[in-house]
């Protein structure tokens, strides 16, 4: 018996691809069950379950990397009917990006045609894309990026008390006006203005963002990729932290110390010194009193 695709079949394989189907086991060998659905045969590896000839089995129908019709009991993260997240596994500049959507021995391609024109904004390995599956007239399965309206429909509204929170976001749209992101843990949308980033993030890139406000009209969050002002004092703050560590966690200098003593020890002005101390105190790294400054 032939169990592979038949050129002369009268059934519609296209309609079954990338969907959940129920078929009947009609044959088996040592490695696989063979499941019939509307005149088509799908292979189900025996490693996925214990069945017998005559059993009805429900699973996800697809063609594997070898081009063979297959059924899996593993639930994919995306189907033809439902969007889901996929993880980028590979990038081909001539074809697009490959996604893992939890289908055994199968990655899904998101075509170059729907990716950003600037290839430096393409997703990289490990990035996340929100897709549903589509099947072309050659029965090939592709990943279809979610439209912006899809994110608007599924996302909730921002709360009033989110100012200055650090959150996790994923870029779902790049425009000249800025980066549009989805916050999966919060089910909210956000926007990063070009002034609030050092470089443009990739489509699908995961980001650590900070809330700086929200739009009243639609309750989407305004976000920043830039650190708080006191977190940007890298050189001076690090200088003080290093000195404190070398002195066993305490130094006799604090914000009331003489400018000359500060300059002689740290080679920075008293203004720089006080600003760095203030930032470190806000971060909870030090405390000050009349005896000096102590590491926490």
Regions found by a protein language model. Give the residues of each.
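Single-stranded RNA-binding regions, centering on S1/OB-family and related RNA-binding modules
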Residues: 2-296
């Amino acid at each position: 018996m032939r169990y592979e695709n038949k050129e002369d079949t009268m059934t519609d394989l296209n309609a079954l691809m990338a969907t959940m189907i129920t078929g009947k086991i009609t044959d088996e060998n040592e490695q696989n069950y063979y499941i019939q659905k509307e005149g088509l045969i799908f292979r189900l590896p025996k490693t996925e379950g214990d069945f017998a000839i005559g059993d009805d089995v429900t699973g996800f129908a697809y063609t594997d990397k070898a081009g063979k019709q297959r059924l899996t009991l593993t639930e994919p993260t995306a189907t033809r009917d439902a969007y889901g997240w996929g993880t980028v596994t590979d990038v081909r500049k001539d074809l697009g990006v490959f996604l893992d959507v939890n289908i055994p021995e199968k990655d899904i391609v998101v075509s170059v045609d729907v990716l950003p024109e600037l290839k430096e904004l393409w997703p990289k390995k490990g990035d996340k894309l929100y897709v549903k599956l589509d099947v072309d007239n050659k029965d090939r399965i592709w990943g279809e990026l979610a439209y912006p309206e899809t994110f608007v429909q599924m996302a909730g509204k921002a709360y009033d008390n989110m100012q200055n929170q650090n959150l996790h976001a994923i870029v779902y749209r790049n425009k000249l006006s800025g980066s549009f992101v989805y916050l999966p843990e919060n089910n909210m949308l956000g926007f990063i203005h070009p002034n609030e980033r050092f470089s443009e993030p990739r489509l699908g890139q995961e980001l650590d963002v900070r809330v700086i406000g929200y739009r009243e009209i639609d309750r989407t969050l305004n976000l920043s990729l830039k650190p708080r002002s006191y977190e940007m004092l890298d050189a001076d703050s690090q200088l003080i932290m290093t000195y404190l560590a070398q002195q066993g966690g305490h130094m006799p200098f604090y914000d009331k110390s003489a400018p000359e003593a500060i300059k002689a020890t740290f080679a920075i002005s008293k203004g720089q010194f006080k600003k760095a101390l203030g930032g470190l105190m806000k971060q909870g790294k030090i405390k000050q009193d009349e005896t000096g400054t102590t590491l926490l």
